[in-house]
């Protein structure tokens, strides 16, 4: 009887043991990316897990304990070049307790979080290893308010954004263009019919655009993303601001539900919602990048929060008007090298466009989901043509609206660059007096240039801005 009871007990234990093993999630893959200030590891899982992370010194190590998991891949296959990681090893402490040890050549600051499945990936565990200097800088940098409780004073469209680089002697600084290659790293963006990744196409076009802009005296282009790594959406505009950008240009090559969709588009921020169903779909899709790439507990599924973002107030009207202006010039130039999806600048709530002090545009270079366009977008020749057209529109805008203290402004003031006609697209909340003040022209001159009998203007109206210096207003 005792033997029978003993065997029965062992059988129960084995059954429980087997059930635990079957219930354990599998680590099916590990991916790694290096960014300028951190290294990201992504563990692809077959199901949700619990985890903890801690550090050890002498030697420096990061220990990741994953409960309810088994390793079903080889860690030795990871490419560790250009990272602080010297090796990655693991031990199955029990059938459902996995420990991963990351040996590092220098101390790092780990941050980790889990991500639920989405349309592209299953459950994931993300571990970011921040270089100590970058982590210290992040901790010491005050957080930027998302939505100020009181309106800020309007920002001139030709006035340099805050935190600019100090002007060079003589006030001849470069006009700085921040170029943001969409997606990257964990977030591949849209996929083409032959497996092309949007993140690769956008980076290639961004690098070509940087090369062409840097050939123009008085201009300097800075890449927001220089390689294949993920950057959260809000971080992209922060990087542009730190670089002292006068203009933020985000490059994309998106997909649409219909594979027949084709043509390039240019977007600016909308203060009243998307201007078309396609614009709304694209904005929703792009703004989910933070969910795909992972931004800790931040979720963009909440549409109210996503569309609220940085609320459009008085401080954004000048930036929005400049965005629409430069966007139209870029769109006109692009129409000479590729078909357009829409012949006017569209507006939608793209997160990367919500910067109150930097004019910003998003260029959809085409639909990578379209078979013909995906082939063109992968072509170096077409990428060069697209970059040339974007660069041309940017140059036209800044020759007409150079920020004070720049080389281009000094050349225009000396008569070496024709100022040319300036235009302003009226946006919600603007008055004729505010526009006159912004461009430093008199109300009388502004009325005369546009044949106005009074100060009444309409949203969407285009005003010609005269080159008259500010005179005493009547």
Predicted regions and their residues:
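Bacterial N-terminal signal peptides
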Residues: 8-20
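Signal-peptide-cleaved, periplasmic/extracellular N-terminal interaction regions immediately downstream
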Residues: 20-177, 431-437, 442, 474
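Soluble periplasmic/extracytoplasmic beta-strand elements of cell-envelope proteins
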Residues: 33, 40-44, 52-54, 61-67, ...
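Intrinsically disordered, low-complexity glycine/proline-rich and charged
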Residues: 103-141, 372, 381-402, 458-459, ...
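Stable alpha-helical elements in mature extracytoplasmic
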Residues: 126, 198-201, 205, 209, ...
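Catalytic-core regions of hydrolytic enzymes
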Residues: 144-301, 316-328, 415-417, 434, ...
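Active-site-adjacent mobile loop/cap segments within catalytic or ligand-binding domains
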Residues: 247, 308-409, 447
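Primarily a LysM-type cell-wall glycan-binding module
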Residues: 414-443, 461-462
């Amino acid at each position: 009887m005792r033997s029978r009871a003993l065997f029965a007990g062992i059988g129960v234990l084995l059954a429980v043991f087997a059930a635990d093993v079957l219930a354990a999630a599998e680590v099916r893959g590990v991916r790694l990316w290096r960014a300028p200030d951190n290294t990201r590891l992504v563990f692809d899982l077959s199901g949700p897990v619990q985890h903890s992370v801690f550090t050890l010194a002498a030697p420096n190590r990061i220990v990741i304990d994953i409960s309810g998991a088994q390793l079903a891949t080889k860690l030795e296959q990871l490419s560790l070049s250009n990272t602080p990681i010297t090796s990655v090893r693991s031990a199955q402490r029990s059938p459902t307790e996995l420990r991963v040890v990351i040996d590092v050549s220098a101390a790092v600051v780990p941050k980790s979080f889990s991500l639920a499945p989405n349309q592209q990936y299953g459950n994931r565990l993300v571990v970011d290893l921040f270089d100590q200097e970058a982590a210290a800088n992040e901790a010491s940098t005050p957080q930027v308010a998302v939505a100020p409780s009181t309106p800020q004073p309007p920002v001139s469209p030709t006035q340099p954004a805050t935190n600019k680089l100090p002007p060079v002697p003589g006030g001849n600084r470069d006009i700085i263009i921040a170029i943001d290659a969409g997606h990257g790293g964990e977030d591949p963006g849209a996929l083409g019919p032959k497996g092309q990744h949007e993140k690769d196409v956008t980076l290639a076009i961004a690098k070509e655009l940087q090369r062409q802009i840097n050939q123009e005296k008085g201009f300097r282009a800075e890449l927001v993303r220089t390689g294949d790594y993920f950057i959260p959406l809000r971080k992209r505009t922060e990087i542009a601001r730190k670089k002292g950008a006068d203009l933020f240009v985000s490059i994309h090559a998106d997909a649409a539900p219909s594979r027949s969709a084709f043509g390039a588009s240019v977007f600016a921020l909308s203060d009243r919602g998307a201007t078309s169903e396609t614009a709304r779909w694209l904005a929703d899709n792009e703004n989910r990048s933070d969910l795909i790439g992972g931004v800790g507990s931040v979720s963009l599924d909440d549409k109210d929060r996503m569309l609220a973002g940085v609320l459009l107030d008085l401080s954004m009207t000048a930036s929005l008007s400049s965005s629409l202006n430069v966007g139209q010039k870029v769109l006109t130039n692009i129409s000479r090298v590729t078909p357009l999806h829409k012949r006017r600048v569209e507006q939608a709530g793209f997160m990367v466009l919500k910067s109150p002090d930097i004019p910003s545009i998003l260029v959809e270079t085409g639909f990578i989901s379209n078979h013909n366009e995906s082939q063109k977008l992968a072509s170096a020749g077409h990428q060069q043509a697209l970059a040339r057209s974007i660069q041309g529109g940017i140059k036209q805008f800044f020759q007409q609206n150079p920020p004070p203290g720049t080389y281009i402004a000094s050349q225009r003031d000396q008569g070496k660059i024709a100022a040319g006609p300036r235009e302003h697209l009226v946006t919600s909340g603007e008055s004729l007096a505010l526009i006159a003040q912004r461009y430093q022209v008199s109300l009388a001159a502004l009325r005369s240039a546009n044949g106005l009998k009074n100060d009444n203007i309409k949203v969407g109206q285009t005003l010609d801005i005269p080159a008259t210096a500010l005179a005493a207003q009547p």
